[in-house]
């Protein structure tokens, strides 16, 4: 213990106290795409990609946030890991939507776009056309284009560190192989229950091959290199309610269990009575898939829905034509419905292929087998039915042909597609009538 000397009668001037420079508290600035760490599942996707796994496959149910994941992953890899990232979308609309999402996170992205098409509005993402498209030379960057556009470019000039393939179950294995010229690492994100790639060429020679170039890219990739592939599964849907999840999960995703995390959302009729999440209407059809009775039923149901109110966590409001979609199996059906409801310009009407990846609060679906008297052809494609039954958030009305149960009952016992349709139709017939 230190004591003062006895002869000291007054305090001596205090010696200056040496100052020690204390380290400053570091400021942690958020980096582009950092929200990907907020969920342990999406964080695993980032970890797998950043770790250098040659292929990462992310199977997802409808409405699980695939587009958001792709945008966050690309922004994180470019902004935090300083990588050159390519994003391959399957349609121009998907590419534009991704450009908007990525542009909201980082200013290092560009959308490769043909000068022949009108320039889309993509805030935060520049439009790159012509032959002068390049990655930045001093930091990471992101280039977004359709798969077809990527295959038109020169891999020697646009080589990237990692290629993210959005809606990859819509891409063929042949397309994925061609994209391999751009990057040695690939991330495939998509929905395995939706429509397979549209292939117009002859594919009989690969009929029994699990790695045929016409097959969905992730399925063939797993068949060819399963041991080298990391798989991270998204197991929650934020779009579909519990009733819809219970309908489509066992029928279309038997190996991909998932649950609903959609916030409460429903419609009410003019009397305030809640509408069920799923309802159906049976129609007598005599003139095939183009029967006017089917078109009339769809149009009448849309008019009824436009008199309802939408209830969400944000409040209550009248349902508008911007909130409603009609999905059909055929272009001619969609055209007839669109013409009948032409006074509702914001109503979304299209085929399952056209509406794949889109959503609305309320949807009217024309059953793909309506008007058919056999189960041959593309009408029984499970992927098409899956898309048609999963575009809605609050309500789905399904217009059915009253003869369809008899048609499916007469199908061959080993017809797996017809068996899936029988299961789904039985569940639909147990929903309330409109």
Role assignments for model-derived ranges:
Residues 104-152, 351:
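Inter-Walker segment of RecA-like/P-loop motor cores
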Residues 31, 46, 50, 113, ...:
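A residue-identity detector for tryptophan
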Residues 19, 45-49, 105, 124-128, ...:
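A broad, low-specificity signal for short, low-complexity segments enriched in glycine/proline
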Residues 9-24, 138-139, 211-226, 339:
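Short N-terminal secondary-structure initiator segments
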């Amino acid at each position: 213990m230190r004591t003062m000397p006895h002869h000291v009668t007054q305090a001596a001037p205090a010696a200056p106290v040496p100052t020690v420079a204390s380290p400053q508290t570091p400021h942690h600035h958020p980096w582009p795409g950092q929200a990907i760490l907020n969920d342990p599942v999406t964080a695993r996707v980032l970890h797998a990609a950043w770790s250098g796994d040659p292929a990462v496959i992310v199977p997802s149910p409808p409405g699980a946030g695939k587009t958001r994941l792709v945008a966050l992953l690309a922004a994180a890899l470019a902004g935090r890991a300083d990588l050159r990232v390519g994003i391959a979308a399957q349609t121009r609309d998907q590419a534009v939507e991704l450009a908007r999402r990525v542009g909201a996170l980082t200013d290092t992205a560009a959308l490769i776009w043909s000068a022949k098409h009108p320039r889309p509005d993509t805030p935060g993402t520049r439009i790159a056309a012509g032959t002068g498209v390049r990655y930045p030379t001093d930091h990471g960057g992101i280039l977004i284009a359709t798969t077809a556009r990527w295959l038109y470019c020169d891999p020697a000039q646009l080589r990237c560190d990692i290629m993210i393939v959005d809606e990859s179950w819509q891409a063929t294995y042949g397309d994925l192989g061609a994209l391999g010229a751009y990057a040695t690492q690939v991330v495939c994100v998509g929905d395995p229950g939706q429509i397979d790639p549209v292939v117009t060429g002859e594919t009989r020679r690969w009929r029994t091959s699990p790695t045929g170039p016409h097959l969905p890219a992730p399925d063939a990739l797993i068949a060819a290199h399963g041991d080298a592939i990391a798989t991270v599964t998204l197991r929650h849907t934020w779009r579909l309610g519990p009733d819809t999840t219970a309908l489509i999960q066992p029928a279309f995703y038997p190996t991909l269990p998932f649950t609903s995390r959609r916030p409460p959302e429903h419609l009410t009729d003019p009397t305030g009575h809640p509408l069920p999440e799923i309802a159906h209407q049976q129609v007598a059809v005599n003139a095939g898939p183009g029967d006017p009775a089917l078109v009339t039923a769809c149009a009448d149901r849309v008019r009824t829905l436009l008199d309802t109110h939408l209830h969400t966590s944000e409040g209550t409001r009248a349902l508008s034509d911007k909130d409603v979609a009609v999905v059909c199996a055929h272009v001619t059906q969609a055209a007839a419905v669109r013409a009948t409801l032409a006074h509702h310009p914001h109503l979304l009407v299209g085929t399952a292929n056209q509406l794949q990846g889109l959503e609305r609060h309320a949807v009217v679906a024309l059953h793909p087998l309506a008007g058919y008297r056999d189960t041959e052809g593309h009408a029984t494609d499970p992927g098409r039915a899956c898309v048609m039954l999963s575009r809605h958030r609050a309500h789905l009305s399904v217009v059915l042909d009253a003869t369809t149960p008899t048609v499916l009952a007469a199908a061959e016992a080993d017809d797996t597609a017809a068996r899936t349709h029988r299961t789904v139709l039985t569940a639909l017939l147990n929903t309330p009538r409109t």
